[in-house]
């Protein structure tokens, strides 16, 4: 009987400890690959929300470049990979152009300065919101990653037949 009480108390303390220290590191979740020497790895832990099916996460990447009054952007590619044996997705930002594309307007009196410039990643930047798994993204070292959480409002419009 005394052993059962000790076991029960141990389990209670262990459960309290685990709940208090629930911030899991990435290696506690799954064996995601380490970044290469030319990459950095971003890990986004999303908070639990009540209606996650109404949310989306948009990934946005930037890279520093000279910018004046012209529209400037870099090309790039967002590739989805699956963690073998686990089935979890992770993402790789790749093929980021060395030189930005730009409109060619004259900018009299405007001096170009170094600013963060968008990296166009294609049409796959909207991801399903899932607070149970982190979003893991590998990017070149010169690229910064940002994200936006999009909320669907409660108004659903009907399309008209025509």
From Swiss-Prot:
It comes from Rickettsia felis (strain ATCC VR-1525 / URRWXCal2). GO terms for molecular function: serine-type endopeptidase inhibitor activity. PANTHER family: ECOTIN, PTHR35890. Transmembrane segments: none annotated. Gene3D superfamilies: Ecotin (2.60.40.550). This is Ecotin-like protein. NCBIfam families: PRK03719.1 (NF002987). Belongs to the protease inhibitor I11 (ecotin) family.
């Amino acid at each position: 009987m005394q052993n059962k009480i000790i076991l029960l108390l141990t389990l209670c303390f262990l459960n309290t400890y685990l709940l208090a220290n629930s911030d899991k590191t990435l290696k506690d979740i799954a064996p995601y690959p380490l970044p290469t020497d030319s990459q950095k790895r971003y890990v986004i832990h999303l908070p639990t929300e009540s209606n996650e099916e109404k949310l989306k996460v948009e990934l946005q990447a930037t890279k520093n470049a000279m910018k004046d009054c012209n529209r400037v952007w870099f090309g790039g590619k967002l590739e989805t990979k699956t963690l073998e044996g686990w089935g979890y997705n992770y993402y790789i930002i790749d093929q980021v152009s060395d030189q930005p594309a730009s409109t060619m307007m004259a900018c009299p009196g405007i001096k170009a300065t170094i600013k963060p410039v968008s990296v166009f990643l294609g049409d796959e930047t909207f991801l399903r919101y899932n607070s149970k798994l982190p979003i893991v993204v590998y990017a070149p070292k010169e690229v910064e990653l940002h994200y936006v959480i999009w909320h669907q409002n409660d108004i659903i419009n009907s399309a008209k037949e025509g």
